[in-house]
């Protein structure tokens, strides 16, 4: 039994593409960045905490279970861009991303309670130059409101991406190849 410790519909959709049956549970954790924590360490810590929280929360569901936690952050010049609090916050983020290359880090952890496997995937994403009116129009679609970095590559925000180097599915929220490899190591995946 696999538990996806996430309420993200994007992660659930991606995980279903691997072909492994799973159940979703919410993993409520404190997502505050710790002082001196790099973006890479931060995203890996959150993925691990989510997996552990999912494993603990699913104790009544199945004895033999794995829990998968994942987290994705958008980073530019070593600064993590989270989900925007309001339009001004989203505008600032999108202005910073405008015409620039940034990184998207996605970490995935799978735990069986006593065993833990983790991966970190880095993807470079380059944006076109954005005008103020493009940013305002994009905000009005509602899409940026709950997205790290204020954009969704799989949605309307994809039209701003001029180049991607790495895993598209990792930018969406779950790197398929790497997740399948983790599941294989934990004996639950379909082989390539």
Curated annotation (Swiss-Prot):
Tagged with keyword Hydrolase: yes
Catalysed reactions listed for this entry: dTTP + H2O = dTMP + diphosphate + H(+); UTP + H2O = UMP + diphosphate + H(+)
An annotated Gene Ontology molecular function: dTTP diphosphatase activity
SUPFAM superfamilies in UniProt: ITPase-like
GO cellular component: cytoplasm
EC id: 3.6.1.9
Pfam families referenced in this protein's UniProt entry, alphabetically: Maf (PF02545)
Top-rank EC class of the record's enzyme: hydrolase
Subcellular location: Cytoplasm
GO biological process per UniProt: nucleotide metabolic process
Keyword Transferase appears in the UniProt entry: no
Annotated function: Nucleoside triphosphate pyrophosphatase that hydrolyzes dTTP and UTP. May have a dual role in cell division arrest and in preventing the incorporation of modified nucleotides into cellular nucleic acids.
Family in the record: Belongs to the Maf family. YhdE subfamily.
PANTHER family: BIFUNCTIONAL DTTP/UTP PYROPHOSPHATASE/METHYLTRANSFERASE PROTEIN-RELATED, BIFUNCTIONAL DTTP_UTP PYROPHOSPHATASE_METHYLTRANSFERASE PROTEIN-RELATED
Stated name of the protein: dTTP/UTP pyrophosphatase
Native organism: Pseudoalteromonas atlantica (strain T6c / ATCC BAA-1087)
Lineage of the species this protein comes from: Bacteria, Pseudomonadati, Pseudomonadota, Gammaproteobacteria, Alteromonadales
């Amino acid at each position: 039994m696999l538990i996806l410790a996430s309420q993200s519909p994007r992660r659930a959709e991606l995980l279903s593409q691997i072909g492994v049956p799973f159940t979703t549970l919410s993993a409520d954790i404190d997502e505050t960045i710790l002082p001196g924590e790099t973006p890479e360490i931060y995203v890996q810590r959150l993925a691990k905490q989510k997996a552990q929280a999912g494993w603990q929360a699913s104790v009544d569901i199945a004895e033999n279970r794995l829990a998968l936690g994942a987290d994705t952050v958008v980073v530019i010049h070593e600064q993590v861009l989270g989900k925007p609090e309001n339009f001004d916050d989203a505008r600032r983020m999108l202005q910073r991303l405008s015409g620039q290359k940034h990184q998207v880090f996605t970490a995935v952890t799978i735990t069986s309670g006593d065993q833990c496997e983790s991966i970190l995937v880095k993807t470079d994403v380059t944006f076109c130059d954005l005008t103020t009116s493009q940013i305002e129009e994009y905000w009005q679609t509602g899409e940026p409101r709950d997205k790290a970095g204020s954009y969704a590559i799989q949605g309307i925000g994809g039209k701003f991406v001029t180049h991607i180097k790495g895993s598209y599915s990792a930018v969406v929220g779950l790197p398929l190849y790497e997740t399948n490899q983790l599941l294989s190591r934990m004996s639950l995946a379909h082989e390539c």
